[in-house]
A protein has these predicted regions:
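Membrane-proximal intracellular helices of multi-pass ion channels
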Residues: 1-171
Length: 171
């Protein structure tokens, strides 16, 4: 499990660096994305870079950090069917997919995002960040999102990510 954890952090740091982050930022953000700690080296969080590539890397790392590490181990051992059919996998990824679409709709309706692609990207990012308890942001503020969306975000925090992940240590 430690090899998976460290491997994700190293791969994330390299990907961030390749995407334009300084080595300092790349290492630190990766070390906060995988363990879903969410600390950022800039006050604007991930929005500082204004980069869809960096956002995509962060989504992948947060999703990996929120995935049951025993399931990641199975996946790395080539047991794709065991990974996909485990009860947590479709629920976790299904929740992300459905809620990303819902939040994207809210973002479009409230003018947070300029178009559908941006709304889907930002919606997916915020859903994954909240569901995994990471706390990274790509939008300026939650203050103007309205009570319905804030309530939905609160529910996502309660649902959380998978057991035996960096987000949830329940056994």
């Amino acid at each position: 499990i430690l090899l998976i954890y460290n491997g994700l952090i190293i791969a994330g740091a390299v990907a961030y660096w390749a995407a334009g982050m300084t080595p300092f930022d790349a290492i630190n953000i990766s070390m906060c994305a995988v363990p879903t700690g969410g600390f950022a080296t800039h006050g604007e969080s991930i929005a500082y870079w204004n980069s869809p590539v960096i956002e995509a890397i962060t989504i992948v790392l947060m999703v990996a950090g929120g995935t049951n590490f025993l399931l990641l181990f199975l996946l790395l051992r080539g047991k794709l069917k065991a990974f996909l059919t485990h009860i947590e996998t479709p629920l976790y990824f299904g929740t992300i997919a459905v809620m990303a679409l819902v939040v994207a709709g809210f973002f479009l309706g409230q003018g947070v995002s300029g178009d559908g692609a941006e709304a889907l990207r930002q919606g997916t990012f915020q859903v994954v960040s909240i569901l995994t308890s990471t706390g990274f942001q790509t939008i300026p503020s939650f203050a103007d999102l309205g009570p319905a969306l804030l309530f939905l975000f609160g529910l996502l925090m309660l649902v959380g990510a998978e057991a035996r992940s960096t987000s949830c240590l329940l056994y």
